[in-house]
Amino acid sequence: MPAAGQAVTRSLRVNDLAFAFHEWRAKPGNHEPPIVIAHATGFHGRCYSAIAEAFPDRRVIALDLRGHGRSEGRPIDHWRTLFEDVSAILDQLRIRRAVGVGHSMGAHTLVQVASENPEVFSRLVLFDPVILAPEFYEDSGALYTSDAPHPTIRRKRDFDSPEAMMERFATRDPYSLFTPRVFEDYCRHGLREKPDGGFELACAPEMEASVYGASRTNSGIHDAARKVKVPTLIVRAQQGKSMDFKTSPTWPKLASIMPAGEDLSRPDRTHFHPFEDPEDAARIIAEFAAR
């Protein structure tokens, strides 16, 4: 049994797939509600290890969503699939009144979970939850298709080693924004060994591209946000019109439609706030959770 403060990876079966989650045990005698972390598209739960370790006394669970990290999964055609997975996982784990921490796609998913399962979370801290303005969802069809896929479909998938992946990505956006610890965690835990030798991306390019392609399918997300009654902090990065994720795509009015929503604008940060400054992200989580 790992000691408190050390991560152990476990798995369970949901929707006919094996899902992994990474758990940091609470210090004996600590009965605070757990922290549950849901990651961004193309990443995985261990990218948030530096944040989890900022809470050494507390139980922290970082999920690997469908087709990411150590979880099984096939490409999706609707974002509700992610919600259905996470809801079932948290139900199996008997999670109640947790502090939900989401980033990008993961944050979007936690909003849907909280709206339909109000007993699961007591608070939410959402880093750029990619819930765009309502007009974005007026056409709920696929944003990208198999004939015209998202550019991530061309992402390099095979590497000789984690070190080779680090060497290739170290100076590229957005990875050059990450702290060295987060970048190394992303690479070391973001590859799977291949049976014939070498490594491949744990999140296949087809999987990542399908998430982006389905990004406007959840047209009911604003109605879901209006039903979330727990205190919710929306942390938004610098605003901009580009979609390169150095700026925030999140609708600035999102917090205002949530019964207990609060907006925190951080123009000094990008969409990758938890990766470029995990210490600051952990501070935000701790302060909001302690209210």
Where are these regions (language model features)?
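Active-site loop/oxyanion-hole signature of alpha/beta-hydrolase fold enzymes
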Residues: 15-17, 25, 49, 61, ...
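Conserved hydrolase catalytic core segment
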Residues: 96-139
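Catalytic histidine-centered segment of alpha/beta-hydrolase-like enzymes
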Residues: 266-278
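A catalytic-pocket lid/entrance helix-loop region that shapes and gates access to the active site
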Residues: 127-159
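Conserved HGGG/HGGXW glycine-rich cap/lid loop of the alpha/beta-hydrolase fold
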Residues: 20-72
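Alpha/beta-hydrolase
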Residues: 157-242
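Short beta-to-alpha linker loops that shape the active-site pocket of alpha/beta-hydrolase fold enzymes
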Residues: 64-68, 130, 269-270
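Conserved loop-alpha-helix segment in the C-terminal half of the alpha/beta-hydrolase fold
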Residues: 226-269
